From Swiss-Prot:
Subunit comment: Monomer.
GO CC terms, sorted: extracellular region
SUPFAM superfamilies linked to this entry: Trypsin-like serine proteases (SSF50494)
Alphabetized Gene3D superfamilies for the sequence: Trypsin-like serine proteases (2.40.10.10)
Name assigned to this protein: Thrombin-like enzyme TLP
Family stated for the protein in its record: Belongs to the peptidase S1 family. Snake venom subfamily.
Known EC number: 3.4.21.-
Keyword field contains Hydrolase: yes
One annotated GO biological process: proteolysis
Length: 36
């Protein structure tokens, strides 16, 4: 909402969740096991 596009690998902790229908959520990588 009101954001800007970023380059691939610009935000290394950003998580993009999707399924066969497409994008459904985003999150932040906390460590190698956890996404919030």
């Amino acid at each position: 909402i009101g954001g800007f596009e970023c380059n691939e690998h610009e935000h290394r902790s950003l998580v993009y969740l999707y399924n066969s229908a497409g994008f459904f959520c985003a999150g932040t990588l906390l460590n190698h096991e956890w996404v919030v």
